[in-house]
Amino acid sequence: MKFNFITLFPEKIKSYYSEGLPGKAIDNKVVDLEILQLRDYSNNKHFKIDDTIYGGGAGMLLKVEPIDLALEYLGESKGTVILLTPSGKTFTQSIAKDLADKRNNITFISGYYEGVDHRVTENLIDVELSLGNYVISSGDLAALCVSDAILRLIPGFLGDFEGSLKDESHNEEGILEYPQYTKPAEYKGWKVPDILLSGNHSEIQKWKEANRKKLPQ
């Protein structure tokens, strides 16, 4: 499985995937990584990848041609093509699991400025995804969030800790984990619930189930 990123800021992607668990996943070939600088696929002598909007409108749009040429370069290895945009379908854990289970290559296209030429959406991608009902300055942030959520569900990512996914802090049903505590048992009068200190595993399990929370819809 391979993650491809089409971006204006390759160093952001490289930096994220060179550290911590994502970096180890790349080193251990859990997934392969390819990062394309979008400007490399511009036919403009100034490497221009955006332009003004037909019909008027504020801001600039990413042009269709550089994105198309980048995808042509990837060829069959592009796999599922995802455009990160505020207008896309809201990304969820169940979508992450579905994409991880398919084991297909994934290409992430980061949006910037006012977005992309709509011909990209109509002809070149498989799905638009959004982190939520808000706008951020760079699609790279969204691409990293989505790719990380998918990556951590791929076997081998957590190594010896794979079993912890069964007790995950958030699963595809939208259930959050129960409250968790560590030492000390009391701090500034704030106490860990007595049941968690009791050693009664069956009662502790009941407490955990009773205190799981549902994500707001």
Where are these regions (language model features)?
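S-adenosyl-L-methionine/SAH cofactor-binding core of RNA-modifying enzymes
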Residues: 61-112, 118
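Long, charged alpha-helical interface segments
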Residues: 169-217
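Hydrophobic/aromatic beta-strand patches that form the interior of the parallel beta-sheet core
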Residues: 4-6, 34-36, 80-82, 106-107, ...
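N-terminal nucleotide/polyanion-binding subdomain common to many enzyme families
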Residues: 1-74, 197, 202-217
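Short glycine-enriched loops at secondary-structure junctions
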Residues: 38-41, 112-116
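Short, solvent-exposed amphipathic alpha-helical segments in soluble enzyme
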Residues: 20-24, 97-101, 123-124
